From Swiss-Prot:
EC number: 1.14.14.5
Function according to Swiss-Prot or TrEMBL: Catalyzes the desulfonation of aliphatic sulfonates.
Family recorded in the similarity comment: Belongs to the SsuD family.
Entry keywords, A to Z: Flavoprotein, FMN, Monooxygenase, Oxidoreductase
CDD domains for the chain: Alkanesulfonate_monoxygenase
Root EC class: oxidoreductase
Protein name per Swiss-Prot or TrEMBL: Alkanesulfonate monooxygenase
Record's keyword annotation contains Translocase: no
Gene: ssuD
Amino acid sequence: MNVFWFIPTHGDSRYLGTSQGARAADYDYFRQIAVAADTLGYEGVLLPTGRSCEDAWVVASSLIPATQRLKFLVAIRPGIASPGLSARMAATFDRLSGGRLLINVVTGGDAAELEGDGLFVDHDTRYEITDEFLRIWRGLLTSAHHGESVEFIGRHLKSKGGKLLYPPVQSPHPPLWFGGSSPAAHEMAGEHIDTYLTWGEPPEAVAEKIADIRARAAQHGRTIRFGIRLHVIVRETEDEAWAAADKLISKLDDDTVARAQEAFAKMDSEGQRRMAALHGGKRGSRKELEIYPNLWAGVGLVRGGAGTALVGNAEQVAARMREYAELGIETFILSGYPHLEESYRFAELVFPLLPGRQRANANGPLSGPFGEIVGNHYAPKASQS
C-alpha cells in the first residue's frame, strides 16, 4: 500500500469557499509540505495542473533539492505541449531528481480552459491526440536509451527524426499515471498507462472501473496497477472527524455552491459528472453527503476534480483503505485541509495501522518522528494502537 500526499498549488485554507482561514500558496509553504511528506514517509506527492494552479513542472523542479526520497507526480498535457518538448522535460527532471519522476497524463475535461490554451477539439478527439502523443512520447524516451530516433505519422501528430540525447534514469521511461472515466479514457488507459487513478467513488463503482480497465489492458497483453485520489479527515474520535467535516464547509453559502456547480456542468468530463452526481449540487446533512460508510461528498460541492473524503477515526479510515485495497487499489493519493497540518495528522494516526508505512530512521529509534524523550532519559512507550 503506497500513500502519496498533495502539494496545494491552487491554494489552501481551513474552510472551503471563503478567504477566511486561507494561507498564502507560495514556495515556502509548498516546501514545508514537501519536506513534511518526505520526512513522514509518504511515497510521493501529486501536483495539480491547469490555470487554477501554479505550474506543476516549475514547482516540482524547485522541490527536488528540498527532498531526498519523495517522488513527484507531474502532469503532461497532450494537445497543449508537444510530445518532443514534454519528453525532454521528463528526461531532464528524471535525471536531476535521480529517478523520482512519475507522469500524470492529463487529457483535460474543461473545454473553456482548453480553448484558452489553444486546443479546439471535442472530447473523443482529445483522446485520439493523447493516444498519438503517448506513442511519440514513449518512443522518444525509450529510444533515448539506445541512441535511436522516432518516426511517427498520425492523424493529428507527426514526428520525423525525433530524438532525445539525454535518456531518463528510469527505463524505459518514467511510469505513466492517468485518470479518466469515459470509455475513450478507459481504452487509452488499457493500452498505454501503468497506473490508473480513479477519484473516490464508492467501492462498487471503483470495482466496476477496475474490472473494465483490466479487461481492456488484457486485450493489449498488458497488466495495470490502480490508485485512488481522496481527501481525508481523520481525528482521534469519529465525532471529532465529522465535526471537522462540517466545519470545512461551514462558510459555504448557496450562491457559492451554485456558481461552482454551474462551472462544473459546462465541462465535458465524465469523471466530473460522476463526482457531481454523488451530492446533487446541494449542501446537505451528514446523512445526505455520506454516500458510503465514512465516504463524504462535501468537498465536491465547490472543489473540482476529486470531491470525496474519507472521514472517521483512524481505525475507520484504515478499514476503508483496506476495503479499497482488496479491490486492487495499491496507491492512495490523499490530501486534507490545511495540507501541512493534515499531512502530520494522517501520518501520526493512520500510518501505524498500515503495515510498513513508518519509514525506518537511519539515526536510530530515539530520533524517530513520533514522540519526545521522557524525563531526559527514556524513549516514549510505543503506541498500542
